[in-house]
């Protein structure tokens, strides 16, 4: 689902989004961003 990467990918404190983005892309999303240290797929 849309938040399938929240628990699978960490969001670092200073904007290291790559892990989140890669996870989201793997699940067919366009990418991801970090909000409040949680990964959100877009």
From Swiss-Prot:
It is found in: Secreted. The keyword Secreted applies. Gene3D superfamilies: Knottin, scorpion toxin-like. Expressed by the venom gland. The keyword Disulfide bond applies. Belongs to the ergtoxin family. Gamma-KTx 1 subfamily. This is Potassium channel toxin gamma-KTx 1.2. It comes from Centruroides elegans (Bark scorpion).
């Amino acid at each position: 689902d849309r938040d399938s990467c929240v628990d699978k990918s960490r969001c670092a404190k200073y904007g290291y989004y790559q892990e989140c983005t890669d996870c989201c892309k793997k699940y067919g999303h366009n990418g991801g961003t970090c909000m409040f240290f949680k990964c959100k797929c877009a």
